[in-house]
UniProtKB/Swiss-Prot annotation:
It comes from Escherichia fergusonii (strain ATCC 35469 / DSM 13698 / CCUG 18766 / IAM 14443 / JCM 21226 / LMG 7866 / NBRC 102419 / NCTC 12128 / CDC 0568-73). Its EC number is 2.5.1.72. The gene is nadA. Gene3D superfamilies: NadA-like (3.40.50.10800). This is Quinolinate synthase. Belongs to the quinolinate synthase family. Type 1 subfamily. Catalyzes the condensation of iminoaspartate with dihydroxyacetone phosphate to form quinolinate. One of its GO terms (biological process) is 'de novo' NAD biosynthetic process from L-aspartate.
Length: 347
């Protein structure tokens, strides 16, 4: 009988917050980064959850701001020889797996993810070994070694479609690491899913009591929820989806006021998509008094302007992502399956 690692008992130490920069310092680093990107034949790939000034810089320099699936597509297809990945470590690893010939830089190699940390490979391997009859599907928010154990990698934007497909083939599933997303997918598809018990430290902090109070304060608002949130929060939603799907929902919903239950980094692109709508942050536990993440990933916040400039300028060994070649080849198989499946959905 395997003993599952219990992420709920783990307390992940948060990184130190970057020192705030002055207006002049920000301007200095922005211009420096633009120059270094050209000199290095590099392009920025930034996640929706990075700080607004990072997303803005990616836009201005011809880079990409997107969810993890589109980040993977963009980086693999772009002709630049160097990718500067503004995100968390698994995103840099994924870029290297898909583009081994490219130099993959990150502002810091210490930018973690609680879902990744909550799925240690030794315990996960033992869990999979105890259920050899199940197809292993892992979320993109996992390490390269966990991906290498999987049959499929998936992002939240195509999770329901993929599991529905596997269920139609009669396959039973191991899902890891996010338990909330796994339960959401199970509810949507009816598939036989055995869930690992990881959580995102940001989404897990949204609580129904505080959200209900905000809903009563703004009864005309629609509620948009990422499926990494607890089921009780998902049940309150007018729209549920990945980051890109939530932005699309913001445009199609008729409501002029939107309560958004995901990392507040998404507000930069969402507000661009709906400039005339009011966006409200869904409250986290304690409404700011006792929350740990307070609706913003502390590791995403490590992607500051100074750190990006240093990654492009200094010794690459401190900022370059490496993945063992044999491991990369194994992890590439389920990643390519994901990309091929996503391509069929796009038509």
């Amino acid at each position: 009988m395997s003993v599952m690692f219990d992420p709920d008992t783990a307390i992940y130490p948060f990184p130190t917050k970057p020192t705030p920069l002055s207006i002049d310092e920000k301007a200095y680093y922005r211009e420096k980064i633009k120059r270094l990107l050209k000199e290095r034949n590099a392009v920025m790939v930034a996640h929706y959850y990075t700080d607004p000034e990072i997303q803005q810089l990616a836009e201005e320099t011809g880079g990409c701001i997107s969810d993890s699936l589109e980040m993977a597509r963009f980086g693999a297809k772009h002709p630049a020889s160097t990718l500067l990945v503004a995100g968390v470590r698994f995103m840099g690893e994924t870029a290297k797996i898909l583009s081994p010939e490219k130099t993959i830089l990150m502002p810091t190699l210490q930018a973690e993810c609680s879902l990744d940390l909550g799925c240690p490979v030794d315990q996960f391997n033992a869990f999979c070994d105890a259920h050899p009859d199940r197809t292993v599907v892992v979320y993109a928010n996992t390490s390269a070694v966990v991906k290498a154990r999987a049959d499929w990698v998936v992002t939240s934007s195509i999770a329901v479609e993929l599991i529905d497909h596997l269920d139609s083939l009669g396959e039973k599933i191991i899902w890891a690491p996010d338990k909330h997303l796994g339960r959401y997918v199970q509810k949507q598809t009816g598939a036989d899913i055995l869930c690992w018990q990881g959580t995102c430290i940001v989404h897990d902090e949204f609580k129904t009591q505080a959200l209900t109070r905000l809903q009563k304060q703004y009864p005309d608002a629609a509620i948009l929820v990422h499926p990494e949130s607890p089921q009780a929060i998902v049940d309150m939603a007018d729209a549920v989806g990945s980051t890109s799907q939530l932005i699309a929902a913001a445009k199609t919903l008729p409501h002029q006021r939107l309560i958004v239950a995901t990392d507040r980094g998404i507000f930069y692109k969402m507000q661009q998509a709906v400039p005339d709508k009011e966006l409200l942050e869904a409250p986290t536990a304690g409404e700011g008094a006792t929350c740990r993440s307070c609706a913003h990933c502390p590791w995403m916040a490590m992607n500051g302007l100074q750190a990006i400039a240093e990654a492009l300028e200094q010794e690459e060994s401190n900022y370059e992502v490496h993945v063992d070649e044999r491991l990369r080849e194994r992890a590439l198989v389920p990643l390519n399956r994901m990309l091929d499946f996503a391509a069929t959905l796009r038509g």
